[in-house]
Amino acid sequence: MPTTQITHETIADIPLLMHILHDQLEYDKLLDQIDPPHGNWQGLSLGKTMVTWLTHILSEGNHYMSHVQDWVAQSSHLWTGLWGQAVRPLDVSDDRLAEVARRLSLSEVWEPLEQKITQRMVRVYALATEQVRLDTTTAKVYGGSDVSVLFQRGHSKDHRPDLRQLKVMLAALDPLGVLVGADVVPGNTADDGLYVLMIARLRSTLPAKGLLYIGDCKMGALATRAYVVRTGNSYLTPLAQVGGLPEQLDKWVDDAVRGKVHLQPILDVDGNTSLGEAY
C-alpha cells in the first residue's frame, strides 16, 4: 500500500505579496519584455527572479542576496506552485541576483521599466496624478575608495563628512507618497541639476502638462522653474533666502499690507473657501 508523504512549509505573507507583484502589477512580465532572458539562461526568468527577490525583501525585511537561496529552499513546493514551474534554490543564488541588480542598473533597462511600472501602478490603483513632490536624500557607506563611481564625499545630511555617500533623487505623488521615480547619482552631485532630469523623465510617464511640482528651495533655481513653466506645468517652492531676496521679500509683504498692490483671492478647489490673498 503506497504511503503518503506530507511536507509542511510556512507560507507567511508570500502568496499575498506574489499576488500584488506578479498577478496585479506584473513586474516579472514587464522586465522580461524589456530585457528578454539570454538563450542560455535556465530556470526562473530574469523577471521572475527579480520578483522572488522583491518578495524576500518585503517579507523578511532583508535585502541581503546571500539569504535568499536558503529562504526559497525552505518553501520549494510553495514557489513551484506560485510560479507554475519547478523552482530550484540555485535559481536565486547570489550570482543570479547580482546579475539582476546589474541589469537593473543599466539606464536602457531601468528607465523603461520604471516608466511601465509607474503607469501600471497608477492605472491599477487609480492614483491621482496632479501633484509630484521632488526631493533628494543621501545614504552613507562605510566602504568605497577613490575609484568609486557612486560613493563620493559630499555635503552630508547625516553630519558625517568623513564617510562616503550616494545620493538619490526621488519623485513621489502627493499626498500619498507613492514613489514614481528614482535616480541614483554620486554622493558629491549638486542637487540643482537633478530636478530637470527627473521632471523630463516623468513627462513620459505621467501627464506631460498640468502637474504641480513641489520641492524645497534647491528646486527654486531659475533654470528649473523656467523649464517647468515652459513644459506647461506649475511649481511650488520656497525661494532661497540669499542675495538681496530677504530685503525684497520684506518690501513685497509691506506693499501688500499697505494696500499698494492689488491682491487676488486664492480659493480652495470648491471655489468658495478662501485660502488667502496674493499678487
Segments (PLM) and residue ranges:
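An anionic, glycine-rich sequence signature occurring as long contiguous blocks
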Residues: 164-166, 173, 184, 234-279
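Dynamic "connector" segments at or just before major functional cores
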Residues: 1-152, 162, 169-188, 196
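Feature marking long nucleic-acid-engaging regions of large polymerase/nuclease enzymes
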Residues: 57, 211-212
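Short secondary-structure boundary/capping segments
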Residues: 146-155, 186, 199, 222, ...
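Short, basic/hydrophobic alpha-helical segments
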Residues: 193-210
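Compositional signal for N-terminal targeting/processing segments
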Residues: 180, 205, 230-233, 239
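Acidic, metal-coordinating catalytic cores used for nucleic-acid/nucleotide bond scission
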Residues: 190, 212-223, 241-244
